[in-house]
Amino acid sequence: MSTPLITPDLVAVDLVATDRDDATRQLIDLLYAAGRVTDADGFHADVRAREAQMATGMPGGIGLPHARSSHVTVPSLAVGKVAAGVDFGAPDGPATLVFLIAAPDAGDGDHLKILAALARRLVHESFRTALTDARSADEVADIVTREVVPS
């Protein structure tokens, strides 16, 4: 991928959200502002449709909304840290780390590779702790790039 999967402008370290839909929308707005999504409302509808199929909460305080969409220009990952937590349907409670994967409609392979690589890292408490402890968007983007993005 020539465009980085994640950059600091796609990270919200102090995300305050009322629910998962609000958290997702705020991350979509970051993608839109960065020019990675052409229609924020359209992509939001695609993410909602995917969420309606199955909850995307994972154990360990993780929300992992994702969708392929014609409104996405390049595979991207936006991250939000939500101190108060947001319910993404995980059995162990609210998510404090939210990862929004956005992939172009034609990007089946990219979407699955990103999802698989991220899921492999998220099972490790040390990875989740490093992200939780990171104080800046630069730190979060660096950790994700180092640990998730294939070299």
Question: How should these model regions be labeled?
Answer:
Residues 1-151:
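Cytosolic covalent-transfer regions centered on His/Cys nucleophiles
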